[in-house]
Each structure stands twice: as structure tokens, then as C-alpha cells.
Amino acid sequence: MTEYILLLIGTVLVNNFVLVKFLGLCPFMGVSKKLETAIGMGLATTFVLTMASVCAYLVESYILEPLHIEYLRTMSFILVIAVVVQFTEMVVHKTSPTLYRLLGIFLPLITTNCAVLGVALLNINENHSFVESIIYGFGAAVGFSLVLILFASMRERISAADVPAPFKGASIAMITAGLMSLAFMGFTGLVK
């Protein structure tokens, strides 16, 4: 049980996919201008990333390895991610039309988020068990959402601040992301 908690903490804080492994930078920079959109993207990504980790583990264990076609891993995981995103979109559309309208554009964008594919591939490369795959995927998603929401709230505050002209826009956003990355480096010794 302790190793699962350490895996979760390590994935969320120590080995954050955005700030340490630099995966998912496109939605991190593109969707973080407003807090509401960052929360919507974070929730949708959390569900998809967790489900994609589970499905990728099952595809690897029960299809690719028994048939000795591991070389199709990347293509099959991309297909799995697309199916999970489409399934998520259909379920959200049927069960909660309000949430579907809120998340509208964000659900299809998750298919192109490299963090989702990265988590699925790293799960297999690190030989995680089924439960560890779930925890790793969920932890990566929570870490992504945490960083995205924190960054969006900082960008909203910075947009109201008096920033010098050369630093406005993407420049101050990159500086802020760098400072966030430095702050998360403080967690480095927390988990081995």
C-alpha cells in the first residue's frame, strides 16, 4: 500500500509530466489563459488519461505481447486513446449535456495531447502492474491538472498586473512556467 502512495505522490509532484518530463506543453500553454477552461481541460484529461492507461495496459498484456507484435505499440496506443476520447465524448454527451457544452472543444483536443501517449508508453516501459498503471495514469492526470490550474490562476493574476512591455504575452508566461518548474524541483528528494 505504501508503494502505491509513493507512486502517486511521485507522479503528481516529483516527476510531474508537464514541469519535469515536458509532456503536454501544448495544452499547458494554450488552455491556461482562463481558469474555467483550465479546470474543464483538467477534468477531461484526468478521466481520459486514467482510462487510457488502463486500456493501454490491457492491450499490451492481452493482445500485443501474446501475439508478439510489440512493434505496433505506438500505433495501437494512439488508436486506444482515440477510442477512449470518443467513448468519453459520447458518455458525457448522453449523461450531462451541460458538461458536454462546457468541455466541448477540449475533449477532441485530448487526443493530440502527448502526455496521454507518454503515460501509456511509460507505463509499459516501467513494467507497471495493472494497479500501478491505474495509479500512475491517475497521478499523472492529477499532476497535469494541478499544474494547469495553478498556471491558469497565475496567468489571470499576471494579466491584471503591470508587466513591462517586452515581457507581455508569451514571454512572461514562459518565465512563470520556468519558476513553477523550479518550485516543483523542491519535491525532488521527497520520493525515491
Swiss-Prot record:
The entry's keywords: Cell inner membrane, Cell membrane, Electron transport, Membrane, Translocase, Transmembrane, Transmembrane helix, Transport
Gene Ontology CC entries for this record: plasma membrane
EC number: 7.-.-.-
Record's bilayer topology term: Multi-pass membrane protein
Biological process terms in GO annotation: electron transport chain
Membrane-spanning segments: 5-25, 39-59, 72-92, 102-122, 134-154, 171-191
Description of how the protein assembles with itself and partners: The complex is composed of six subunits: RnfA, RnfB, RnfC, RnfD, RnfE and RnfG.
Xref: HAMAP family: RsxA_RnfA (MF_00459)
Protein name: Ion-translocating oxidoreductase complex subunit A
Encoding gene (name): rnfA
